[in-house]
């Protein structure tokens, strides 16, 4: 019996131990087991690839498992999400009340899985998404840099150097002639507006040379014969570089090193120094917005100032807003505000460009707009959240897309006639300019060239421009004022270059309903472009 009793005691002990290992113990037993269980979160779960990566950072085996890139998360300043469950679970035994601990027992693997699954998803998403920005950033950088590397230089792009972009120019050859004569090839016209006016006279001489060269190229590219075109371009290039060296020797500074040579050696030197011998330049990013179209409203309107009051009054008849919008259109309130403001502007402009009147009209109109905004239960304009105050006015002023009221004005350069330029001139546009002789030139270009096939329009317009300049400096010399003294220069490329820089560089092109503009200008035979000689837009 004694042996049987001892055996029964051993079996009872084993049964109790087995029941305790299966979670059937008391709350006290749970408090003893939970810390050990949470200590193993991350590797005590059944083996699976995702869970094998979720080792705590401070685990002794964490450095021996998982892919090599997983280790990068350990050196990041923010604590990893994988370590967070461990820190929270270590505090649970001390922080949880007793009644929480004696609740219904949970399976031992339920809590680790719930804690681990979120921590597995986020690191994987972060680590899969992290390389993407690096991959994206590695490609756009060269493109964004190249887009502006040949564009107009200024101090914001690293200061002025010893030469302008594209100088010296490449020598014309059969390899680059087509690129030289490409209609859409862009180049910078240099002058006081984009060159330093002190201590950099060598850049001014380079800019004048490039301007002179482009004028000659424009003339040569009109030759129908490829051979004649190439010979013409070569002569223009050689003359331009010879003129440059003459200008270099006319000052007391050290001349360009190629100018110290003579004849063919000088030309070969310039050719070897050319940074872009094939003239394959990227198009420079334009800061001039295209003429807007569609139902885009210029809202909020810019605050009237002494600087934009002329545009507000003198260009008011060219500003147009869409009509007949549906009554439910969300732009209706903005459209109504613009119409009311234009009506008030008309009253103020009749008082002699009254700035105080326009500013008060602007403020009152936007206050009424905000009143209508709050009359409906929709999203209200951000600025209307402010009460009527200078803060609200400043908010609207900052968000005005066209603070100068120049949405429908595009400044064009008639110095270089291209197919794209003719596309603007032959459309339903109005040209405004200070110079009284420009309307006649634009009229001739559009009336005689817009009916031709598109590829021939630019060539025709360039010939009309040269003819018109010769006429202005010839029989009609005394009927207009020439403040730049262009007609005193030698006829040809030098004279044309002077016109391009001083008279044709900035011409305002206005888009809109020009039929309502009364008593202004004339209309060409194509019915496309209206001409107006006025001092309203700013050209300089």
From Swiss-Prot:
The gene is ECM1. Interacts (via C-terminus) with HSPG2 (via C-terminus). Interacts with EFEMP1/FBLN3 and LAMB3. Interacts with MMP9. Involved in endochondral bone formation as negative regulator of bone mineralization. Stimulates the proliferation of endothelial cells and promotes angiogenesis. Inhibits MMP9 proteolytic activity. Glycans are attached at residues 354, 444, 530. Sequence repeats lie at residues 150-279, 283-405. Residues 528-540 have a biased composition (Low complexity). GO terms for molecular function: interleukin-2 receptor binding; protease binding. This is Extracellular matrix protein 1. It comes from Homo sapiens (Human). It comes from the Eukaryota. Expressed in breast cancer tissues. Little or no expression observed in normal breast tissues. Expressed in skin; wide expression is observed throughout the dermis with minimal expression in the epidermis. Keywords: Angiogenesis, Biomineralization, Disease variant, Extracellular matrix, Glycoprotein, Mineral balance, Osteogenesis, Repeat, Secreted, Signal. Residues 150-405 are annotated as: 2 X approximate repeats. Residues 71-85, 146-156 have a biased composition (Polar residues).
């Amino acid at each position: 019996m004694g042996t049987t009793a001892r055996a029964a005691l051993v079996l009872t002990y084993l049964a109790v131990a087995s029941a305790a290992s299966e979670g059937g113990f008391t709350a006290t037993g749970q408090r003893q087991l939970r810390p050990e269980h949470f200590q193993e979160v991350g590797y005590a779960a059944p083996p699976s690839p995702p869970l094998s990566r979720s080792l705590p950072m401070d685990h002794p085996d964490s450095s021996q498992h998982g892919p090599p890139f997983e280790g990068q998360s350990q050196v990041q300043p923010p604590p990893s999400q994988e370590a967070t469950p461990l820190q929270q679970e270590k505090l649970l035994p001390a922080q949880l009340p007793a009644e929480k601990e004696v609740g219904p027992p949970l399976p031992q693997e339920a809590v680790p899985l719930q804690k681990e699954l979120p921590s597995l998803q986020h690191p994987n998403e972060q680590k899969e998404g992290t390389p993407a920005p690096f991959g994206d950033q590695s490609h756009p950088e060269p493109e964004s840099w190249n887009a502006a590397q040949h564009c107009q230089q200024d101090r914001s792009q690293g200061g002025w150097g010893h030469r302008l972009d594209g100088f010296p120019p490449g020598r014309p050859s059969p390899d680059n002639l087509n690129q030289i004569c490409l209609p859409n090839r862009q180049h910078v016209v240099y002058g006081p507006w984009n060159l330093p006016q002190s201590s950099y006279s060598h850049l001014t001489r380079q800019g004048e040379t490039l301007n002179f060269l482009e004028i000659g190229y424009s003339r040569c590219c009109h030759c129908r014969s490829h051979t004649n075109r190439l010979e013409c371009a070569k002569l223009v290039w050689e003359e331009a570089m010879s003129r440059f060296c003459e200008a270099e020797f006319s000052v007391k500074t050290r001349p360009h090193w190629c100018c110290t040579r003579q004849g063919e050696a000088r030309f070969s030197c310039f050719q070897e120094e050319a940074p872009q011998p094939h003239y394959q330049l990227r198009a420079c990013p334009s800061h001039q917005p295209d003429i807007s179209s569609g139902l885009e409203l210029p809202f909020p309107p810019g605050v009237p100032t002494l600087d934009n009051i002329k545009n507000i009054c003198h260009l008011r008849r060219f500003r147009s807003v869409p009509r007949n919008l549906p009554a439910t259109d969300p732009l209706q309130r903005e459209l109504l505000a613009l119409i009311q403001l234009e009506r008030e502007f008309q009253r103020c402009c009749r008082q002699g460009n009254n700035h105080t009147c326009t500013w008060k009209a602007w403020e009152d109109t936007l206050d009424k707009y905000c009143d209508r905004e709050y009359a409906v239960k929709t999203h209200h304009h951000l600025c209307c959240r402010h009460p009527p105050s200078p803060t609200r006015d400043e908010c609207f002023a900052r968000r005005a897309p066209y603070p100068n009221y120049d949405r429908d004005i595009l400044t064009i350069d008639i110095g270089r006639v291209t197919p794209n330029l003719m596309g603007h001139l032959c459309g339903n546009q109005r040209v405004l300019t200070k110079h009284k002789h420009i309307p006649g030139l634009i009229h001739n270009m559009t009336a005689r060239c817009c009916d031709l096939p598109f590829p021939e329009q630019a060539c025709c317009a360039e010939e009309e421009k040269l003819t018109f300049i010769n006429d202005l400096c010839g029989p009609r010399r005394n009927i207009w004022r020439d403040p730049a003294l262009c007609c005193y220069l030698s006829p040809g490329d030098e004279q044309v270059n002077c016109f391009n820089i001083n008279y044709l560089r900035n011409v305002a092109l206005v888009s809109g309903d020009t039929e309502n503009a009364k008593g202004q200008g004339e209309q060409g035979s194509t019915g496309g472009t209206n001409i107006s000689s006025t001092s309203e837009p700013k050209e300089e």
